[in-house]
Amino acid sequence: INRAREHAVYSAIESLGISETVHYFDPVTGIKIASYLTDAHVCDSGNWEEVTKCIAALREFHSSKLHVAHSFDLWERLDFYESLWKGEPSIYADYDKTKRAVLSLKRFIDEQPKSIQLCHIDAVPDNFLFVHDTNGAEQIKLIDWEYAGMQDPHLDVAMFIIYAMYDREEAEKLIDLYFIDGCDKLTRMKVHCYIAVSGLVWSNWCEFKRHCGVEFGAYAQRQYDYARE
């Protein structure tokens, strides 16, 4: 994690009030002091009323079209996490085939129109917190901005889907929630491509963590399945 970049992101979003209130952030060590959010709960990905509110908050954040000096390169991360295996083979017998299929999506993704802007990248249900202000009004806070950078905001939609481990029907429902004015065929295809690529990115990350003795079980398998299927 590049803490200087994370610090830049918190500076960029400060005026939005969408994150926790940060009082101190050391861009070298990453030490952060923030106000504690009391009586908070994370988004329940199976509760579509909560999901709808979170996606609306994500869409509102995207509407700000903020910029920072760094980007999140999906393809670079794919190779980087694989490089952390130190030459060890994947636990998946068809990994090479799956990776080739995922890489073949790059041309299509690159050809699609995009509005490159600050994206959260880790916009998953667990990072949306439901809290209440001093008057008791419900608020949604989006936390954990360490991966945030310049990207296509539609990638954030894909990230929510794969962390929630949605099936195809649920994924389509989530896409429709985000695109309130309708989603054209090519954009929908692009989101599904992001689902596949992101699935392999986080699968590779899970394989690295496995080498470190940390197992992610069903989550790791599901990420690979998004890439493969």
List where the protein language model places each region.
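Start-of-helix signal in alpha-solenoid helical-repeat scaffolds, especially tetratricopeptide repeats
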Residues: R3, M189, C193-V197
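An alpha-helical support segment within catalytic cores of ATP-dependent transferases
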Residues: L66-I121, P125, V131-D133, D176
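Short strand-connecting beta-turns/loops that link adjacent beta-strands
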Residues: P27-T29, D133-A137
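ATP-binding pocket architecture of kinase catalytic cores
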Residues: I1-W75, W85, P89-K97
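Amphipathic, Lys/Arg-enriched alpha-helical patches that create a basic surface
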Residues: Q221-E229
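Pre-DFG segment of protein kinase catalytic domains
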Residues: L118, K141-D144
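Active-site activation/catalytic loop segments of kinase-like enzymes and analogous catalytic loops
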Residues: H154-C183, A196-V214, Y226
